[in-house]
Amino acid sequence: MERGILLRQLVEAEQSVAESKAFIAQQQRLIVQSERDGQDAAETIRLLGKLLLLHQSREQERARILDELFGAS
């Protein structure tokens, strides 16, 4: 694939990884707050699990792009 396209994809992947990290941190804060306030955090915890899977997928995509850019095997 053309290097310019890969670089653009890498920028997008980096942004996605950063966004998912921020969402995970926010969700973790909500869990702590809910538990501290005596509220049920089950749904918040389930959502955190989904966010962690999404983050893992985004990191894998970033790694794939880096491999393609720099020829790592």
Kindly give the residue locations of the regions a language model identified.
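Anionic, Ser/Thr-rich low-complexity intrinsically disordered regions
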Residues: 1-73
